[in-house]
Structures are given as structure tokens and as C-alpha cells.
Amino acid sequence: MLGKLRDLMGLTPETDIYDEEYPQGTARTLTTEPGVEPLPASPPTPTHDFDTRPSPSVATGSVPTGSTASNVIGMPNAGRWWGAVAEVLVMQPRSFSEMPEVIKALKERKSVVLNLTLMEPEQAQRSVDFVAGATFTIDGHQERIGESIFLFTPSCVQVSTQVGGVRPSATPTPTPPSAWGMDAQQHHSA
């Protein structure tokens, strides 16, 4: 009885060695070890490593995960309809170590007002660069709204400023001529 249980569970080594399946009506070669009777031929039953029943997540419109799912990544809060309440998170971090929270909020499609007045200038600059890089990767927007105060928004938020508003436009600083530009001009003139 224990042997039959092992056979059913597939714990015994296979003793049947057979060739590829042939169309019906052609002979098949079947060899077995001595003392072992071959099983009667039966049509193969399909075996699947996955469940073919529809999952509950398909009914809700979300993307299924697992080996049968496509490479599409669901957007958090993508099911929001127009006119839904958008969340704005106001943060006043004291160190750079709090910046991953800002990135997480942006990934959750929340706008973030970042007040960096409590940070050291070097850490504040590093923080702005870090969050600006993450904002760029999600096609978001950034806007300076005050001294050491910045607005970072995901791509689903449109930011507009008033023309002639409170914030003066930045004046471009003249850049020194590049050494590369001088070399290129000298080679063309020769």
C-alpha cells in the first residue's frame, strides 16, 4: 500500500522509458525494467502549473500578479476619477534620512511641499537634488515657492504660476567660455 501511495505522489523514480508520442495508428516502443508491468495506454491529461480560474483581482480592474501576469505595473491610485480630492503633504525634514518618505509620497501620486529651513544648507541642497532626480524619473514637476521651500508634484498634477507674480524670475548668470569651445574654434580657423 505504501508503494501505491508513493506512485500516486510521484515519489518513486520513473521506470517507464518511452519514445515521443506518435499519431494514432502508429506503433510505439515501450521498454520497462524487468519485473515491472507497463501501465495501459491512456490519453494524456493536461497538467498546468497555474490556476485557470479568474482571480478576484481581475474583477476589480487591477493587474494580476504572478507568473501569468504581463509586465505592466499598476499605478497607485490610478483608479481615481477626475475631481477626486488630491492630497498635498507638507514636510519639514531635519535630515537627509527623511527624503525616502518624500519619494514614497510622490510615488503614491501625492504632491509634497518641502520646507528645508531646519536643515543645514549642504544637506538641504543634497535633499533637493535627490528629490528632484526622483521627480524627474516619474515625469513630475518641481517648483521653488520660497526661500528653502519647494513644491514637488507627480505627473498627474499641473502646476502653473501667475505671470508677474510674487516669485521673481531667476536671472541667468553669465557662464565663462568653455575650454572645449576655444579648442573647437582654433581647429576650424586653422
Swiss-Prot record:
This is Cell division protein SepF. It is found in: Cytoplasm. Residues 54-71 have a biased composition (Polar residues). Residues 15-71, 164-190 are annotated as: Disordered. Cell division protein that is part of the divisome complex and is recruited early to the Z-ring. Probably stimulates Z-ring formation, perhaps through the cross-linking of FtsZ protofilaments. Its function overlaps with FtsA. HAMAP family: SepF (MF_01197). Belongs to the SepF family. Keywords: Cell cycle, Cell division, Cytoplasm, Septation. Homodimer. Interacts with FtsZ. One of its GO terms (biological process) is division septum assembly. Pfam families: SepF. GO terms for cellular component: cytoplasm. The gene is sepF. It comes from the Bacteria.
